[in-house]
Amino acid sequence: MNTKTRSFTDREIRGIPSNERSAFLKKRYLDSPLMVDIEYIKHLTASHKRTDSMEIIERRAADHAYALSHMTPVIHEWDTLAGNKTRYIRGAIPYVNYAAGPFLKEMRKEEQDAQSKYTEQGQGGGIEKARHEAEQDDFRLISGKFLIPREEYNEFKEICEYWEEKCFMEQGERLWKSIFNKAEFIENGWKTGLYTAPHEPCPEGRLILDFETALAKGYNKIIRETEEKINSFQPGNILDGAKLNFWRAAVSVLKGAVVFVGNYASQAERMAKEEKNHYRKEELEQMAYACRNVPMEAPRNFREAVQSFWFTYLLGHIEGSHLGYSPGKLDMLLYPYYKNDPDTSPEMAIALFEELFVKMTQIEYIASLSWQGLGHGNLYQNLILGGLDKNGDRADNELSLIILQAQVNMQMTQPTLSVWWDNKLDSEFLMKAVECVKTGVGYPAFFNQSIYIQHELKTSGLPVETIRKHAAIGGCTEPTLQGMAYGIVQAGFVNHGKIIDLVINQGIDPVTGIRMYEPRELESFEDVLNYYIDIMHEAIRNWQQYWNYVMIAHRNTVPLIFCSVFVNNCLDKGKCMDDGGAVLNQSVTTLSSGMVNVANSLAVIKKLVYDDKVCTLEELFQATREDWVGFESLRKKALGVPHWGNDEANVDKIYLDLYYDYCNWVAGQVNYLGKPYDPSMLAISTPVPFGKVCNAFPDGRKKGEPLADGVTSPFPGTDVNGPTAVIRSSSKVDHSRIRGGLLNLKFHPSALRGESGSKNLLALIKTYFENPGFQVQFNVVDSRMLIDAQLHPENYRDLVVRVAGFSAYWVEMSKALQDQVIWRTEHSL
């Protein structure tokens, strides 16, 4: 083993699991390869072949219930919480009922989607383990990093072939490609990198269920209430029949879920009878006892409350191909059960959450190669703490501290933690949150709850008490209402950087040569700005209309039934979420990435071409076409123009003008549920692949370099006036205009050392939110340590860093994404 380089400053806080079990569970996870488990989709397919005559809502429920009831109830060594999504420690269900094409293309050795060639995956950790084991005769490799047992490979191929013409993606393509008059624009958008790859393989998520009702009522009571609706049903018009379909579907999936849980109870009982170790036997008996009660009935104690939550959360996860499906406000949900259970000590609660977080991290997803690269394997499960209750009082509690401590100890990538900020929050809670940040894992992220309340008051008009109670984060950084919203289902991202390419080259993509927009005379700065805006408008409008077509196919192939049961108003209305059953249907967003690069480039154009007349517009554009080779002096001048993130009025105004135009245009289009699209801007891993498809920019960025991440994060190396200037620039934005937001800041560990360092960071957050900002997150890491981790990855298997709205294991990140994190400006306080 290599000896770690000691010329860097390590993290101040180094947590360790609280007990032997937690340490074992974490190590087992880290040592496991990534696996594909076809069991669920095999049973779903078997049912689908027999249910062709059924109405789609009831058919979807029947197929899902059948699959649930036939899944193997796997209880791993040392588990005390029952329930797993797959049979493996790190397992993914291939949802070929959503998209079979990407798997079949790989099996047939056909070309993947246009963006797959720009996709990079990590090399280490579980990925390396899978690739090594794939060299053996027992396994085949899928999607570059997942193993499938060789004896299941041909069966999986047959399942994919069955779904090839029936899956959601194929049904959607048949619809929009035959009707939509901008279909060619969409396909060219994928080829050029104007858009992220097709999102049908994993469209759903950013969804949080009503776990409060699930726990308090239990499934049996919900089944009885729904059956009463069915029995008392009297149609008033022909459309009322859809209510009956949904209610029967709801009962079907709930009964399937009860069988799923009962199978775990039976398995635990069988294992307990055979177990020789007295302590393990008691654990299995306790597990079986809990599984005979929850989630069918209300929990009797804290452990059962956690088990009940986990079953409902897991069952919702199994139903759909989710990214961003989240646990929500777990401290508020579970605190009453903890407070009223004298037999559960803080230490016991910490251990239980440590196990829960391992189980959440064990859930993997497999999709198209492009989306695996964009997501970097993260499911964006977001657990939000703190904030206010419905009455406006602070909502942090003892369980908030316990959850933070559990992640300080474990440092798992799932769930990412977040904090709803309010000045009423307890200082001990905030200091514990900063302690977690100082481990270097990049969470919790901090969100200004008052900004989200303003946004929701504008978009939904719901009472402020309702918004406070249900406010949560679904996915990376997207606020939503827990148990009340459809989720934030969107098409993917628009690449603002590619639009710069199109402006520079008169509507032609310089990489592929495809014409995306008509040429235009550019005489003034306003001409350049308006050309950019017009192309952006065209790209967004076409993207939104395309997605509206796609979601028609979603409703007709893979509507969410189980999840709809636990979203308010669906059962009352007799409508699933795809039919508009949720309370909130305005949460559908349009996403984009790279606007900071646009603002920087326009600022340089304005300064060098039109204000100072250092060069002509064509000279500057030619410099970017040549990747600045032979134009080094001009590039130096471009880099010398103030960029975003330095509290400089000129570039900040340009950014604000772009931002508000984007918000207004997005909100001017109607989503597939008949409500305005909600503007949002995020990043996930898009800065790397989006940057790869772009030429050099006028702001000094070179060809292929990543774009700026997030919404208001500066381009790496250009924020030269310190973190206070960064937050001043970001504070100029009205963050209540969008559903989401992200500001990345990176600090050297020495900058936050000790209690004074923690208080200084809290003061910075407080200043930002009072200005008012919306979201901020931190990497607290020495860049030299990250460089050492690139050189000696074997010494850093459990190193976690913040990427965008999520954290990831360093060794499982691509080299390009690692470089992007290293490249970010390292600040001091």
Go through each PLM region and give its residues:
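Conserved catalytic cores of very large enzyme subunits
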Residues: N2-W247, Y279, E283-A290, V294-L829
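Extended, non-transmembrane alpha-helical coiled-coils
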Residues: V259, N263-S266, R270, Q286-Y289
